[in-house]
Amino acid sequence: MARQGNFYAVRKGRETGIYNTWNECKNQVDGYGGAIYKKFNSYEQAKSFLGQPNTTSNYGSSTHAGGQVSKPHTTQKRVHRRNRPLHYSSLTSSSACSSLSSANTNTFYSVKSNVPNIESKIFNNWKDCQAYVKHKRGITFKKFEDQLAAENFISGMSAHDYKLMNISKESFESKYKLSSNTMYNKSMNVYCDGSSFGNGTSSSRAGYGAYFEGAPEENISEPLLSGAQTNNRAEIEAVSEALKKIWEKLTNEKEKVNYQIKTDSEYVTKLLNDRYMTYDNKKLEGLPNSDLIVPLVQRFVKVKKYYELNKECFKNNGKFQIEWVKGHDGDPGNEMADFLAKKGASRR
């Protein structure tokens, strides 16, 4: 018997897949140019809709309609580096090989987690990968034919970072390298959020906020001044402006802080932690909302490379990524960022 209910199929959007609530679907299509999506009364109809053209994606998507998880397609783009990453785990389950390096396989499924309580892993078969990612949020997974590329995906290594910043590796290191004799122990969480009153309507007003925990004088609360007044654009700008301020403080103030950005935008989290690594400048400029995306990625890369370059100077070894948090779930920092975003939108 066909499964009945409400099923929202996204054939073209930020994440293709099947969703069982409108809000989940909306997050994938709102503000996305040329989005293709449709509501169905049965899971089988929604699945059939996805089987039409324009369904392919290099990334998999973990959705919540009956536990459906879309299998990622292979990428043959290979990114090589000198050192192997430290922050990932190979398979340990009894159904999988204990060592990827000894496994007789040319297929690697890399799962990168953007939340602290879920471990990043690499699998050598789709079945185990699918079981691991099912019903999990805040993660991204991708298929590779090269183990180093799969590891790079998790560790955040990119061949394009310096090109995106329009600076050579040597110039960046010469300009921003700190003395290794100094250790900085202070850390700070920065919560970012966007808001849009009347989101999706012609009269919508959007704003963004960033809450610097323990440093209220640094908080950001501004209206979104350009482009479509969508919640998605406001969330992008919130993280972008927070990164801009973080960069200014890292490069101008004597006391350095290890900042950690937290946002409830899965799109921004996955873009910065995972997806931008396969984009060059031309690809970035072709993305929806590129007027905000390009500076967002450039600012993120600068901060990330700064911490990488000076990792021995920071207590947490310079670890920096965008952490996804569940929105409207009682997290005081996230609620404060939401308040600042709404305050900014009210000034539009």
UniProtKB/Swiss-Prot annotation:
The UniProt function text for this chain reads: Endonuclease that specifically degrades the RNA of RNA-DNA hybrids.
GO biological process terms held by the UniProt record: DNA replication, removal of RNA primer; RNA catabolic process
What is written in the cofactor note of this entry? Binds 1 Mg(2+) ion per subunit. May bind a second metal ion at a regulatory site, or after substrate binding.
Highest taxon listed in the record's lineage? Eukaryota
A GO MF annotation of the entry reads: nucleic acid binding
Q: Where is this region: Disordered?
A: 54-81
Q: What is noted besides the main data?
A: Present with 149 molecules/cell in log phase SD medium.
* Record keyword Magnesium present: yes
Per the UniProt entry, what species is this protein from, by scientific name? Saccharomyces cerevisiae (strain ATCC 204508 / S288c)
EC number(s) stated in the UniProt entry for this protein: 3.1.26.4
The cross-references to PROSITE patterns, in alphabetical order and at most eight, read: RNASE_H_1
Family as reported in the entry's similarity comment:
Belongs to the RNase H family.
Polar residues bias locations: 54-65
Listed CDD domains: RNase_HI_eukaryote_like
Top enzyme class: hydrolase
* Record-given protein name: Ribonuclease H
